[in-house]
Amino acid sequence: ELAKVSLWLESYAEGLPLTFLDHRLIRGDSLTGPFFEDLLTFPVSGEPIDDLFAQQINERLRKTLGEALAHVNDLEASVGKDVADLEQKHTAKKRLDEALSPFRMLAAVWSGCVMLGDRGSDLAYRNLVTTVADQENIDIHKSLQPALQQMSDLGGQNLAYDLVFPEVFRLEGSPERNAGFDSILGNPPWDRIEIDPKQFFGNFDFRVIEAPNDSIRKELIAKLEANVTIASRWSEICGMIDGEERIHDRLFSHQSIAVAGKKTLGRPDTYRLFVERWYQLAKDDCGYTGWIVPSSFHSNEGAAGVRKLYLDNTNLVCCYSFENLKRLFDIDSRQKFAVAVAKKSALGTSSLRAAFYLLNPEWLFAEDKEDRQLVIVRKDLHRLSGAHEAFVEARSNMDLSLIVAQSNSKATDWGDWLVELGISTAFGVELHRNPAFAHVLSESVDTAARFQICQEEGWHRLPLHAGKTISQYTDMFSSVPENFVSTREAFSTRHWKRSVQGYRLAFRMKAASTNERTMIAAMLTPGFVCEQTLAVETDPMKRPNMNALITLGFANSYPFDWQVRQRVTTSLSNYILAAIPIPNIQQTSTFIFHSTLRLTCNHEGYSFLWNEQ
């Protein structure tokens, strides 16, 4: 209704009635609506409906669409110059809805059935398809099939675009989609498709949010779940989320892709679903899409699928990334967002215009953009970022040229380098999920003193390092280890039993390109475990310590750090680091190793390493 009022205020002409907009402004769920070809598959099994039914339903659709498009023509016959004209439009809209009603009902039932999963019924859906194909009365049939009502209610909010806008997608009444929108604009939600138990149950008891650890939180939640009303609501919400995930998995195929044999990580963000939906809705070879999305579209591993979709199947015209320091959006000032435009094209993207770390939206309308605008060549993306093809965030064309030159002259990259040297890393422990690792140390002493204490005690407990306890080449920084875990508890989880006995390379996970240094790495002594703010080696006994020391020295170097800064947003990961180029350092490896050893061995915990090397 607000959209109508806004358009009426813009388009009002004195002496004419308000424009008829009922067939233009549609309310519905853009992410759960199927296309007509989806309706010819069984919602539960996913198998195609046999040819006989498919042929009947296609013939029925062709006939109905011909009628529907005639009603659309009636709707567009005039601008609505008087009350009689508007009445004619209302009548034409009613006839259009009646003509397409069977197929919209079919779409609602199909979506609902997919969302129900194993509780859905392919048989009930098949019976409904038969009814539609035979032009029987659907309302009567629905009353005979109670399961259909549940499916219809669940999927009733979906927006089946080609059945709502037949004049856009099915020219000349064709049952096949042969067109689409000329242009699509959007600023989609940026939320994750999940619900946080802490937030939900915190609405009923604020102590759930304030709980000091996961164990206490689980106890509080268990008490709340004893309330039938709360438990029922929680079950309903979880079922709704599960249903949405099922239909998204069915309708979208580029949310997660295989890269080097591994699926890209991350639960789908809502914006990624919209980005893929817009591609589906745009007209082949000439439809434009334009949107504002988080900068993760061009940088994150989880967005690799939709990023590749657009690079392969559209001409990605531009991608301009902004910092939110001026609070253009009511989000964290550190979060970045991107304005992107693409034109659907079978030729894909050969190059695109890009800019990063922009602040003022006025820059978009400047005549001269050469001070910040880059031209990123598609063939360079794989070389710079690997198969994920993330965009490097260079600030100038000179920076971009240097990044490309370093990549062209590399001997290997970080990912292959680690494999060659036998180094593997993983995140540390999330304390809120692992309360056994969150015991508080009573004494506040530095790492060197902590090593001595634990050695004297026989290492029956293991202290935790965090990002704030290390800096480059040192495990003693501004903060001291604050937590510990019993050795028995630590050895029963993950890699700690085999890894904690060795000297291990570790680096901070939280890092930004605006920090004094972005890559912060150190060698940890035996006996210490790590929380999630550090990535740490998992199998140090499989490689000589010299390999880790050389890697540490190179990781803390200025050239490597500069490359990291062109890629990082707010945190590091193996995904971001993997494609960073490594030059041939064979002639300098001894110097790097020797210098790193001297910078690292700063207390008794490194005595064995010093003597060994």
Which residue ranges define each predicted feature?
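S-adenosyl-L-methionine
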Residues: 2, 6, 16, 20-39, ...
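Short, polar loop/linker segments at the starts of domains and inter-domain junctions
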Residues: 40-46, 123-129, 478-485
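Non-transmembrane, amphipathic alpha-helical segments
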Residues: 53-60, 84-98, 102, 263, ...
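Short, intrinsically disordered, low-complexity segments enriched in Ser/Thr and Pro
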Residues: 55-62, 135-141, 497, 503
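A substrate-engagement module of RecA-like helicase motors
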Residues: 44-56
